[in-house]
């Protein structure tokens, strides 16, 4: 099996683990926009490609998939998930399976406020989240939330821009200076537990899960 890992970046250990799991039967190909990205050197073969915002990016990845007879393609950065999801059919036509969420799921997961709305509508307990200052003011006046709070980009990743806010003036400055922030209740010293769930791409059923 040949798997293409897009935007490999610094995730050398991840590719190394995949290599060990796949054994001699597997072939790993990686791409990145920089030849200095360490993870590409864990692959059997690599390509230096344009950035994901480049108009030629998608056609470049499709061309690599055709040339290398890639069985499956995935990405190691969040912003690229939507791109692959939107063009799933184009990859399927050349015999390449896209290993990422479907477009509808990707839209929900990549937008933190949309995710909050989805969880709330489905009665799944989650962190209180506000998409703008006005809705936060209403909740604050009602005593539903208090300081400190936590702000982060609505569509950000890698904890970039995420930080604790201790009072109203600081919050107003943050929201005015960075459009697109959301406001969340501060979880304090709560224990952070990540849960990974693996879904079979054919049956769409969960096959394994573990916490870390």
Regions inferred by a protein language model and the residue ranges of each:
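ATP-binding N-terminal substructure of ATP-dependent carboxylate-amine bond-forming enzymes
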Residues: 1-99
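Short loop/helix-cap segments at secondary-structure boundaries that form the rim of catalytic
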Residues: 37-43, 141-144, 173-177
